[in-house]
Every structure is written in C-alpha cells, then in structure tokens.
C-alpha cells in the first residue's frame, strides 16, 4: 500500500498517541513505509508541501528530532524555518500564548513544537489556525518517537502483535516511555517496564504493564529491549546512588541481554549515555536497531506531515 492509498488520517493535529485509534496508527505506519522507500532513492523529494511553510519551534535543545523534522519537511517540498528560542522573544518574557499569536500572524501551515512543560503543545494548538505536531512536551508524550519505534520493530519482526517489549530505565521522566506504552499496547504487544522504584511512576500498573524492579527477571523472554536515557537534567533529588551503581543493576550489557530471547533486538531513542544505561558493545552490536531508528525517524515525520497536509486548505 502506498502513501497515496493509505487510509485517510482523521486528525488535524498530532498531539499525542493517546486518542489515536489502531487504524489511525496503522495508517501513519503505512505512509511511513512508503517514505522509507522514497528516502532510499537517489531523488528523495516529493511536492506534497510545496508552497507550504513549516515552523520548527523548540523550547528544549534537540539535535536529532529537530533535524529529522527539518529534513522531513524539506523532502516534502516545504519551506522550513527553525525558530531559535534562545534568541527569541520567549527568552525576553513573552508568554506561550503571545508566541502562538505571533506565529499565527505569520500564517504558517504547520508548527512542530517541543516544550519542557506537559500540555504546552495542546495549549498552543488551541491558539493557532494551522496544524500542530507535538515533538515532545515535558514528561507527557513524544508521539513521533513511538511511531518510529513501532515502524522499526514492525520492519524487523514482521509485526508487533504478540511481542513482549521491555522498556527499561528512567521511566518516570520519559515521554518516550508513555507514548510507547500506549502505542505498543494498541498494536497488541505485551509491555513490561523495568527500573528502580525511584524511577518508576506511582501507579504505572494502571496502564496495563508488567512492572519489574529486577532487570534480570524483567528481561526474561523479551523480544525487544528498549533502553531509556537517564535524564539527570530533570532530576532535582537523588534518584540513583551513582552512575556506576546504576549501570551495574540497570545498564544493558551482554550478560543481561542474554536473558532475553536469542533473537531479541535492542533499541534506544537517543541520545545514549554509553556506560550508563547501555554498554558500547551492545549499542553497536548485531542486535542493535539504534541506527535504523534514526532512519525511520525521518520517514515517520514525513508520514505525519503528509497526513496532516490533507487537512490544510486545498491540501
């Protein structure tokens, strides 16, 4: 199925995985499959967004996500503007609502937003007339990361239904974990979360996941091991005794990975802290999908932008 024949995406914005149906998710993944094929050709451009303006508004630093959205927009023919918050009016005290009004006056077609506060992207979406994509809001959601993870798994395992996926590490501060839990369960996976009790959200069991504080126990029989970055910049107190101690119990090395299924695959949303949550030989090893995730990120973001373009005037 090509992107042109993929089922229509019914939403004007992509603010999170929560609220998407299974057909919505599968529609985006089908579009992304077509975008992978396009990205591997010599001529990589489409004209889907020709004449359209895309603003990337990042209130938090990002290298891979921002550059991935920029490349995705350009491959679809959009005029892409990266707004530097560090040198903008936001740093001078402008509120998010004022920023939204200012950007709206520029009449963009799509705004891609990353913000440190959960819910900020939803607020901005209510104040503008264009499509909005959530590129990560606080510890709330990161929908395109979950979509690219699902695409990577599907292309390597043939599907997601029935797989056991372990999400390991700093679940408490991770928007990636939240979006992946929702999406993977929607597609029929069994999800486990593994980490020290200090890095697991209170009441996470209500999401229908299995919870383990012993990593060796939690990895047994897993098809996918998804490691999370230890987000020390979001930690006000002492969540782990030391980096060395954390790696000993929760860092993925060969001994721990051997407890998963023999054909288990390893993922990480990046950026990685080598020697903290993952050993270098595992990150660079034959079971690692980490580099492929980066490629899938561009394809998924192309798919999302293309799907939202169908709701633009004359889209």
Curated annotation (Swiss-Prot):
Gene3D superfamilies: Aspartate/ornithine carbamoyltransferase. Carbamoyl phosphate binds at residues 64-65, 114, 142, 145, 270-271. L-aspartate binds at residues 92, 175, 229. Pathway: Pyrimidine metabolism; UMP biosynthesis via de novo pathway; (S)-dihydroorotate from bicarbonate: step 2/3. InterPro entries: Asp/Orn_carbamoyltranf_P-bd, Asp/Orn_carbamoylTrfase, Asp/Orn_carbamoylTrfase_sf, Asp_carbamoyltransf, Asp_carbamoyltransf_Asp/Orn-bd. The keyword Translocase does not apply. GO terms for cellular component: cytosol. Keywords: Pyrimidine biosynthesis, Transferase. It catalyses: carbamoyl phosphate + L-aspartate = N-carbamoyl-L-aspartate + phosphate + H(+). It holds the Pfam family OTCace_N. The keyword Secreted does not apply. One of its GO terms (biological process) is amino acid metabolic process. It is an enzyme of class 2 (transferase). GO terms for molecular function: amino acid binding; aspartate carbamoyltransferase activity. Heterododecamer (2C3:3R2) of six catalytic PyrB chains organized as two trimers (C3), and six regulatory PyrI chains organized as three dimers (R2). NCBIfam families: asp_carb_tr, PRK00856.1. Belongs to the aspartate/ornithine carbamoyltransferase superfamily. ATCase family. Catalyzes the condensation of carbamoyl phosphate and aspartate to form carbamoyl aspartate and inorganic phosphate, the committed step in the de novo pyrimidine nucleotide biosynthesis pathway. PANTHER family: ASPARTATE CARBAMOYLTRANSFERASE (PTHR45753:SF6), ORNITHINE CARBAMOYLTRANSFERASE, MITOCHONDRIAL (PTHR45753). This is Aspartate carbamoyltransferase catalytic subunit. It comes from Methylorubrum populi (strain ATCC BAA-705 / NCIMB 13946 / BJ001) (Methylobacterium populi). The gene is pyrB.
């Amino acid at each position: 199925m090509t992107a042109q024949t993929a089922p229509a995406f019914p939403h004007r914005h992509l603010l999170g995985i929560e609220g998407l149906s299974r057909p919505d998710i599968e529609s985006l993944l089908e579009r992304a499959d077509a975008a992978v094929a396009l990205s591997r050709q010599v001529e990589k451009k489409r004209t889907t967004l020709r004449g359209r303006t895309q603003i990337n508004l990042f209130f938090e630093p990002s290298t891979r996500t921002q550059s991935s959205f920029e490349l995705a927009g350009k491959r679809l023919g959009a005029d892409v503007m990266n707004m530097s918050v560090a040198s903008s009016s936001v740093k001078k005290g402008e509120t998010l609502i004022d920023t939204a009004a200012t950007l709206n006056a520029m009449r963009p077609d799509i705004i891609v937003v990353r913000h440190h506060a959960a819910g900020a992207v939803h607020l901005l979406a209510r104040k503008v007339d264009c499509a909005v994509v959530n590129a990560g809001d606080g510890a709330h959601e990161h929908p395109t990361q979950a979509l690219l993870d699902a695409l990577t798994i599907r292309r390597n395992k043939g599907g997601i239904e029935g797989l056991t996926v372990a999400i390991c590490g700093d679940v408490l501060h991770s928007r990636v974990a939240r979006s992946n839990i929702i999406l993977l369960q929607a597609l029929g996976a069994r999800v486990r979360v593994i980490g020290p009790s200090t890095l697991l959200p209170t009441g996470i069991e209500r999401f229908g996941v299995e919870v383990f504080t012993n990593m060796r126990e939690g990895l047994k029989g897993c098809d996918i091991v998804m490691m999370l970055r230890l987000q020390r910049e979001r930690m006000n107190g002492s969540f782990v005794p030391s980096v060395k101690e954390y790696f000993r119990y929760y860092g993925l090395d060969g001994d721990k990975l051997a407890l998963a299924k023999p054909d288990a695959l390893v993922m990480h949303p990046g950026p990685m802290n080598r020697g903290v949550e993952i050993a270098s030989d595992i990150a660079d090893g034959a079971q690692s999908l980490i580099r492929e995730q980066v490629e899938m990120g561009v394809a998924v973001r192309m798919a999302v932008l293309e799907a939202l373009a169908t709701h633009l005037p004359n889209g």
